[in-house]
Each structure stands twice: as structure tokens, then as C-alpha cells.
Amino acid sequence: MDEKKTFLHYLKYQKNYSVLTLESYDRELTDFLLFIGKESISLQEVDYYVIQNYLIHLNEKHLSHTTINHYLSSLRSFFKYLCKQEIVSSNPFT
């Protein structure tokens, strides 16, 4: 997805994130994008309820609370970036 690629580029070149951190963001965002893709939900349509359903999805994968919190943190950053770039009109985390 172009938005993910642009965001990762921003993290690499503007924020100077490490390769391992970028790989983590890539993995976590890919999981979320696949989740919304299966439900035919666009980034613009993501709201509080989609995030809640994604949280259920993560819990069903038996991930640790720390890992789930990291996924959510990555998504918060991603949506903050998307709002700042005016790619989406609202942030489901605010």
C-alpha cells in the first residue's frame, strides 16, 4: 500500500528510525492492512469500532499485552501521520 510505504519512508529519512524498528512497523501495519482488506474497509473508513475489532483479532492470536500495545502504538503513529498528510480526515485514536 502506498500510504504504508510513504509512512515507512518518512520514519526512515525524517525520523531516522533503525532498520529493526522499521521492520517492526512494516510487519504490524501489514497485519492491520490485511485485516481491514479482508473486511473491505478503506483507511478513510477506519473508526473506533474497526480498531476495537482489530484489538479482538490481536487477542485471538494470543499475543502478549506488550505486543498488542506495540501494534496499537504503531497504528496511532500511522494514523497521526495520515491525518497530518490529509490522507484521512479523522484519527480513530483521538
List the predicted regions and their residue ranges.
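N-terminal core-binding DNA-recognition domain of tyrosine recombinases/integrases
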Residues: 4-20, 26-94
